[in-house]
Amino acid sequence: MAHEVVELRVHGVSGTSAEALLDHPVVTRVAGDDHAGFYRPRPGFGDSDRPAELRAEAYRWGALTAGSAARTLSLLFLLPFMLVNLAVWARPPTGGAGGLIGPVSRLLAATLTAAFVLSIVGVTVDLVGWQCAPYRPCVRGRPYLAWLADLPLGPRLAVLALLPIAALRLLWWLGERSSRVFEAFPAGGQGRSGGAEDRLDRPGFWNDALVVQRLRAIHVAVGLGVLDASLLGAQIHIYSTPIAHVLFVAVWVLLAACVVLLCLPARRPVDGPGRGPVDLRGIRALRVTANTLTVLAFGYTVVPLEPQPPHGQLPGYEGGVAALVTVQAALLAVLAATTLHQRRRSHNPAASWLSGLAAPVFAAAAFAAAYGYSAALVYRVADFLDRGEIPNPARPNAPGAPPLEPPVTYRWAALAGLVAVLFVAVTTVWRIAMTRRRRRRMAEEIVGRDFPEPPPEALPRLADVRAVVARAGVAEQLNPAFLVFLVLSLLGVTVVALDLFGIGPSSLSERLAGTSGQATMALALATDAGIYVIGLVALGILVLGLLSYRSEETRRTVAVIWDLGTFWPRTVHPFAPPCYAERAVPELARRITALTGKGGVIISGHSHGSVLAAATLLQLPADVLSRVALLTHGSPLHRLYARLCPAFLGDPTLHELGERIGWRWVNLWRDTDPIGGPIFSAHRPGDPPRAPAPAGTVDRRLRDPLDVAVPPDDTVPPPINRHWPYHTDPMYEAAVRELAGRLDPA
């Protein structure tokens, strides 16, 4: 090898140290910073059997997604926003700019912001300010609440309404603080794509900072509008004036303007391959109008009006929650129908994960998480305020308990969530049990070919390998569980939405309350169970975030989901966790461009690092790509991304990537790997490729473990490596040297 070649290693999910990535005890950073940096072995430390011209370098980006436990919990708090943002990226190929899926997804995201604000309003303004504070038994012995009882109604509501604004500002701060090291990182792009479909090779694809700012202004206006409407609606009910009506109508005009802006494309159309500039028309006026209306609404609310003492729920709040659920049900149905229509037009939809319905599944999961959080928050606060008596539509409060009445919609949503959780759990168990025999038979065939004549003492180890191979294929068997979840979510949100028309579960509970006590008690127990189960699920998500710091397996599982969700830009919900790829991809592109000025580069991506590598290469110009080769290992490019996000990383994109780099591409995979897999051809060594050349030459299977018997110079059998590590396998080094020899030194 007469020319210098740098093997640039990019790690996968859950991160790893630069020392482990380079398999070297002493490393030094040569570029980047503490968040994401490039490292090399320090010269003079350790021996290497590689040629001097073949150097190793590592890109460590794990700090972009990892952090303290407090940060992880704050990101889990943003889970619903992340899921709805992911929906638009999981759409089927459309051949256009996304069709209806983009606008519908943005509207769904706005309803989640509205639901968030309504849940905070429900706790502060409704439960505390309207229902608890005027009721002396509720504030007795609670000095932190007793002072509110001495305030007039208007000032009390205005003071408590500051908390939803603070919560909205917290969301803004979380996203803004975390994105400072991600967004607005200089991004290039080769601009070779055509057509209207947004593609990963578009210039500026990974620079959406202005899009996020635009969405953030709209969502803040939505949140403030929902708060203003809640305050003014209550004021109109107790003391109607023309000023209140004018402000109320103005707030709804503001919300309508937000809907229009969300339906419009975020970027202006342009001729050519590049992306148009962000359309910021009307955003400044929207921001000024939203702030002005909020100040006026607070000013009107704070004036003491001497109304009748409040009783029951905050006027209009129950109906507002029910109306929001109705809108969400309609939008989710439109999203599902649109996805089904576009799925029929896509290439090979049966090969897609979730049968091409990933977009509505993610949206439904976002709603489930959002209402799980909301129901747990509202009902647990109500449970605390009324001193342990759980409000129930079919069972009256105990004598002497504060008559708190949270929105019954949350209760029905929790019950629907309980039904969905139970059915999904049953479907998952059933599916795993039904496929166990087939997976075991497949594992028997694989292990039998890898180890045809094992010694008798290796039979227990052989059984372990069979079990690992069988478990590695479980993920592909869970499609029915997710589809059941989608169907039940659509049915559940539709049934809950019927409350708005007087034919929903609330009317059923009222009829049951006048009949036999058994039916009433059964309904009460079911809804109570729903509240507790959904609350436990929400708590479990938070606990999972903490456990990920103690268990490597848990951390890896959480990281797979989290790194997938935060890989894509925030083009739907601005309060989703920030997109780390908006820094990682341009940074990798810049480093590769600099290195190719001195020689060749082999970008070696493990697991999710292979996705970053592919996205980076799609942004590089042809003169740089002529000096680049790609080595992927443990890669989910086809197993997960091509099937989950076919519009952006589908098979046509992967074939185009191979052509751009002259098919200087090797992919290593194992049957024991539950995450990675083949990309083009799942053939074994000695078998003909299942795809025509040159794509059929990319995939190379590694036997794992290397043997099931104890080597003569060891005391234990070789480990079952599963998903990590790959770089310690002899086939890995052989692939690196092969690709280095195929690089053009010119």
Task: Describe the role of every protein-language-model region.
Residues E587-G599:
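Conserved acidic catalytic loop of the alpha/beta-hydrolase fold
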Residues L210, R583-P586, R590:
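Short, contiguous clusters of charged residues that form electrostatic/catalytic patches at enzyme active sites
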Residues P621-L625:
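Short helix-capping segments at alpha-helix termini
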Residues A615-Q619:
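Active-site signature of alpha/beta-hydrolase-fold catalytic machinery across serine-
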Residues S604-A614:
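Gly/Ala-rich beta-loop-alpha elbow adjacent to hydrolase catalytic centers
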Residues L547-P586, R627-A629, S635-A746:
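Lipolytic serine-hydrolase domain surface
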Residues M1-P577, I592, A740:
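N-terminal membrane-targeting/anchoring modules of bacterial envelope and secretion proteins
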